């Protein structure tokens, strides 16, 4: 059976002076809690190796909900353990109503009106002022991020050398281009590729809400681009090369944390086949999976091919090409997160369950339908806590690979996952009020 997570490329023990290490955190709504579990395990293995202090990732690129995790790590790059502990605290205490309006009134105001417009748009077109911008209102998320992430610290981390660069990606509804906004202390020239550009910017919370604005689900966010306002949505849309920003920013080794399985084992697809006409929820889940998951797997395979090709070239020929090998470690879920979400659909607030039921999300457990869509919206501790546990266990199961990738000595785990979950809340302890 093929491994659902590709192995690291050219992995070998190395001295701590190896080139800059980048971190890629992809999108996926509530699925981003899995990233936190991976990071918690990496932090523990790092402590076991006798290291602490500043982040091992001076270059971080985040997309969608991964942008929130990326910005948190970057703004606390002087204390990697504290940043990760804070993220664990956030995600295992997060609730739906801290991300989007989940009360009955809020759903009536946005979701039901949006569904009515979709079904009776021809009849209500004259009431343009009432047209909603999205299925759900994510203004609670913006309020949470303004309190949670101290973006002013990013300049300090860059100036002190704890960070080299932070990149946040978004997709412009205005121009159709995929845009990577990046902030650095040292000058790095922006890059231009087909339908994707990079722009140096002073990153803000608004960049995070733009990058995490799941299409149809959350409203677009206006950002300034070359002095003109443009409307942006989720950075996973039209992101054909999610690993590219870290490479452009100078990373020579990259840890990629996915939000879905990179490859399905034989036989697993047939069990998940839709046997009748798909519901709106199943179609939406399929579309979101295409946006969030497919590009990363393709980009990893592309990088593998480039690395393999370069390894076949004579030394002189390798020196003559601008291409360079980039070592990458990919950690992605060993379980289908759709199935995991199906076990926890019942934990959603009644108003959200009612809204999702209207588009075909029904049942719980093995008999559930539409759970792919639910997996992006299930910001509840029962689900995010399981994702954190899964991220930890997947990473610890590949402990030897992780230790080799970072050049840490191979050794047994010094702390069990349960104890890792009980660590103090890091920088989150200094924040006012409950998360």
Where does each model-flagged region fall?
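Active-site periphery "cap/insert" segments of enzyme catalytic domains
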Residues: 129-170, 177-181
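Active-site gating loop/helix substructures
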Residues: 159-252, 256-287, 366-378
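Alpha-helix termini
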Residues: 44-53, 153-158, 312-321
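N-terminal low-complexity/intrinsically disordered extensions
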Residues: 1-21, 112, 413, 423-435
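Patatin-like phospholipase
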Residues: 16-24, 30-139, 145, 182-194, ...
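Extended hydrophobic secondary-structure segments that form protein cores and membrane-embedded regions
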Residues: 22-25, 57-64, 165-171, 328-332
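Acidic, Ser/Thr-rich peripheral helices and adjacent loops at domain boundaries
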Residues: 268-309, 351, 355
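C-terminal helical/tail subdomains of lipid-metabolizing enzymes
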Residues: 132, 145, 308-435
